[in-house]
UniProtKB/Swiss-Prot annotation:
Disruption phenotype: RNAi-mediated knockdown by injection into adults has little or no phenotypic effect. However, simultaneous knockdown of forkhead gene fkh-2 causes 12% of eggs produced by hermaphrodites to arrest development at late stages of embryogenesis and 81% arrest after hatching as L1 stage larvae.
Protein's recorded name: Forkhead box protein pes-1
GO CC list: cytoplasm; nucleus
InterPro entries, A to Z: Fork_head_dom, FOX_domain-containing, TF_fork_head_CS_2, WH-like_DNA-bd_sf, WH_DNA-bd_sf
Molecular function as annotated in GO: DNA-binding transcription factor activity, RNA polymerase II-specific; RNA polymerase II cis-regulatory region sequence-specific DNA binding
One Gene Ontology biological process: embryo development ending in birth or egg hatching
Native source species: Caenorhabditis elegans
Keywords, sorted A to Z: Cytoplasm, DNA-binding, Nucleus, Transcription, Transcription regulation
Length: 264
């Protein structure tokens, strides 16, 4: 009776009897998105490299922030790139200024913005000199440089309970880190240099002497001065190009109509 029922049952039901012989299902792991993010750092968003790649790609954190022209000149002169943090002496201060260290820290983040505490962590993690120094001294200098230089700006969070620091210029194009002094430099903008403005049409000037005294001595001198000014202005108006909608209509002046009153 039982065998007849089994023979009449669908095939997928018969396959359920053999489930005990199958290998057990591996345990389901919790999704990283559902787990609580403890100790989150913005550097956790970067993909981890394997050991072979990371060992072969050990470079200085500042090596990618120099200008292309400086890197080419560096190869031609035979100078080496800046040493990595692993080979630095913990007692020797790095040549990079505070604004250069801040720029490197901000540029290394995926969102190109960091909190002040994250900037501290980047500097102490990549440069062992600051790890052995008193935090109060160099961290105070970092905060001072953030508010001093125009290359950095504070970005408030949406809830208004904190802030991030970002750069106003792109590191590597607008600004760069100098290989010579390790300071943050701004690229020189190519501004067209125009020649000094020249006055092509001189303005007629009256003599510096007292006009009243001249006219009292010679009443005809006023008419002569006005006539000379009129002729010079007419010559200048002929050289000015006509602008559509703004015609230049010179007003003729009759020098003979001016008379200086005679003194009694």
């Amino acid at each position: 009776m039982t065998s007849s029922i089994k023979s009449d049952a669908p095939q997928f039901l018969l396959d359920l009897d053999n489930c005990s012989s199958l290998p057990p299902t591996p345990p389901k792991t919790a999704s990283p998105g559902n787990s609580k993010m403890k100790g989150f750092n913005i550097s956790d968003l970067c993909l981890d490299l394997d050991s072979s790649t990371s060992s072969s790609c050990s470079v200085s954190p500042a090596s990618s922030f120099h200008t292309r022209s400086e890197s080419v000149g560096q190869q031609q002169s035979g100078r080496n790139s800046p040493v990595s943090s692993s080979t630095e002496s913990p007692t020797k201060r790095p040549k990079y200024s505070y604004n250069a260290l801040i720029a490197m820290a901000i540029q290394s983040s995926p969102f190109k913005s960091l909190r002040v505490s994250e900037i501290y962590k980047y500097i102490s993690s990549n440069f062992s000199y600051y790890k052995n120094q008193k935090p109060l001294q160099w961290q105070n200098s970092v905060r001072h440089n953030l508010s001093l230089h125009k290359e950095f700006r504070k970005v408030r969070t949406l809830d208004g309970k904190g802030s991030y620091w970002a750069m106003t210029a792109d590191l590597g194009t607008d600004v760069y880190i100098s290989n010579n002094c390790g300071k943050l430099r701004r690229q020189k903008s190519k501004v067209a240099k125009f020649p000094p403005m020249q006055q092509h049409f001189p303005i007629p000037q009256l003599p510096t002497q007292n006009i009243h005294q001249l006219c009292m001595q010679n009443p005809q001198i006023l008419a002569t001065l006005l006539q000379n000014m009129y002729l010079q202005n007419m010559q200048n108006l002929q050289n000015i190009p006509m602008v559509p909608g703004f015609p230049i209509i010179p007003v003729p002046i009759n020098p003979t109509s001016f008379h200086f009153p005679k003194s009694s």
